[in-house]
């Protein structure tokens, strides 16, 4: 049986150990937490790494990666194919595949030739021969069936109607293209390019005269020297002098024409005025006398 003094001593020692063990455990936990946090890869990547990559040659420095990517993307944008070119390339590729399928001619499977290489062991040589033989057997088994006796179907020629339609279509497209080119040329001729800072001081001068301008010399209106001499003062030829008999005949003809005109006028006036009573003339004379 244990003594009471010994029991008290044991209990005191155990209490002292418990009190002193608590701070040591906390320190150990803190140290383990720091080690775990340092061992995490995310925190390592977050740490800034200072890298000093100096150029090998100061005169020849490389272009930055981002700038190279931008330049490459710009070059690709410039080299982009239009829809027409893409369609054309697709048609050419499709046509080639059709021709290849129509021909149906595939190359024969090459028979391997075996030869032991330098430094190759017998086991490796036999293994290589086995692999190549298995590969040839696989190709021959999975090859498409051939029919060498069957001839290829002849090409269908285009009908005359279809050829004429395509020809008309091409001509129409050519005419449209030419019309667009003419319109574009006219627009360029009508367009006047004005430079920056150009000042206009006067309207443009027309060097070409219109067709119906009065300033131009017409064929019948040219000022010739002979015309000036004829139409100038004293330049015209004098009229021939008429004889006295000729003058008398002309005077008589003129007098006869005047008398005939007067008689015709008088007759016309009498026809226009209505018939009057006989007393009216007497009354008119009386009134005239008064």
Curated annotation (Swiss-Prot):
Where does this protein have compositionally biased stretches of type Basic residues?
164-178
Parts forming coiled coils = 66-89, 155-192
Keyword flag Lipid metabolism: no
Main location, first listed in the record: nucleus
**Where is the sequence biased in composition, kind Low complexity?**
20-39
Region Disordered: which residues? Answer: 1-92, 98-117, 139-181, 269-290
Regions of compositional bias (Basic and acidic residues) in chain numbering: 56-79, 154-163
What keywords does the record list, in alphabetical order? Chromosome, Coiled coil
Q: Per its UniProt record, what InterPro entries does this chain match?
A: CCDC137
Q: Mind telling me which GO cellular component terms the entry cites?
A: chromosome; nucleolus; nucleoplasm
Cellular localization per UniProt: Chromosome
Put simply, this protein is called: Coiled-coil domain-containing protein 137
| Source taxonomy | Eukaryota, Metazoa, Chordata, Craniata, Vertebrata
